[in-house]
Structure formats: C-alpha cells, structure tokens
Regions:
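Conserved acetyl-CoA-binding loop-helix of GNAT-fold acetyltransferases
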Residues: 86-89, 95-108, 128, 132
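Conserved GNAT-fold acetyl-CoA-binding loop/helix
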Residues: 21-47
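A short helix-loop-beta-strand connector motif used in the catalytic cores of GNAT acetyltransferases and
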Residues: 47-58, 68
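Conserved GNAT acetyl-CoA-binding A-motif
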Residues: 108-121
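Conserved beta-strand in the GNAT
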Residues: 59, 65-74, 81-83, 88
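A conserved beta-turn-beta hairpin within the catalytic core of GNAT-like acetyltransferases
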Residues: 74-85, 94, 113, 144-149
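Conserved acetyl-CoA-binding loop of GNAT-fold acetyltransferases
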Residues: 131-141
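A short beta-loop-alpha structural element at the N-terminal edge
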Residues: 3-18
C-alpha cells in the first residue's frame, strides 16, 4: 500500500471540514469537549487556518483513497517548532498505520527536527504512537474538563 500526503487546495475546505467532523465525532461523544474539539469546528475556522501562510493541509491517501487529513504548521524560520494539529483518520481506516506513515511523511517534507504536537492523555494509543515516532512528553498538560486532559509532545 502506498501512503502519500497530497496538498489540499482552497476548494477542498468543505471536504477537510466534513472528514474532520466524522473523524473526531467518536472522541467528541466520549469527552464532550465543546471548546476545542475539531468535531465542532466550522467552515470559517478551517478557512482561517487554511489562509495562514504557515499552514498546509494535506490529505492522507492510501492507494489514492483519502483516508484522513493532517495539518502542518511550519513557519520555515528554523527556530519555531513545526506543529501537527490536527491529524485525523477516518474511522474505517484506523489501526492500519496511516497516521504513523502520515507523520513520517510530514517530517520528510518539512524536515525531521524541531516538532511539537499534542493529543489526549486518556487515549493510550495516541500517546503510544507519539512516543513510537520519537516524540517525548513535555511537562505541560492542559485539563479541558473532568474527562479530558491534553498532553504535549516535542521532538528535537
């Protein structure tokens, strides 16, 4: 199976939004995070980020099938950490290694060093993936509600 990142275009914003809503719906139901969940974002939120010069959205494809979306924030200044936020895999494509391959490909495109990302502390599989890819937890966490804590990772 060939995994690729395909740069999204302006006309893809609705597709990005719909894929993100579907991909994060289960986590939204589980944690009821109305403030920061990608499942609750609107078109204008994606449009705002899409227009940021440091942001690139990519479709994650497996044999030319769209299986998810990843957003990379890269100021390309050699100082500011690059950021993945968010990465989403459609439910029917999970647990097949697509997120891992997408992160590796993003690092290949944007450079392997000086990254950060965050994930849900309570989602052990997400934390395992970050650590498997060489990211280490920082001391920073953010409690969103009584069910959900965000943990932050970096990779040098």
């Amino acid at each position: 199976m060939i995994i690729k990142l395909i740069k999204a275009e302006f006309e893809d914003i609705n597709t990005i939004l719909q894929m993100q809503k579907v991909a994060f719906a289960e986590l939204y139901e589980k944690y009821q995070d109305t403030e920061t969940s990608p499942a609750t974002e609107k078109y204008e939120d994606i449009l705002f980020r899409f227009n940021q010069p440091e942001t690139t959205y990519y479709f994650i494809t497996a044999d030319n099938e769209k299986v998810g979306v990843i957003r990379v924030v890269d100021f390309k200044d050699g100082v500011t950490r690059k950021r993945i936020s968010p990465i989403s895999i459609m439910p029917e494509y999970r647990n097949k290694g697509y997120a891992q391959h997408a992160i590796i490909e993003a690092e290949h495109i944007h450079g392997k060093h000086n990254w950060k990302l965050d994930t849900i502390l309570q989602e052990a599989g997400n934390c395992y993936l970050c650590e498997k890819l060489g990211y280490h937890q920082t001391s920073k966490t953010e409690i969103i509600n009584d069910k959900l804590t965000i943990v932050f990772y970096e990779k040098d």
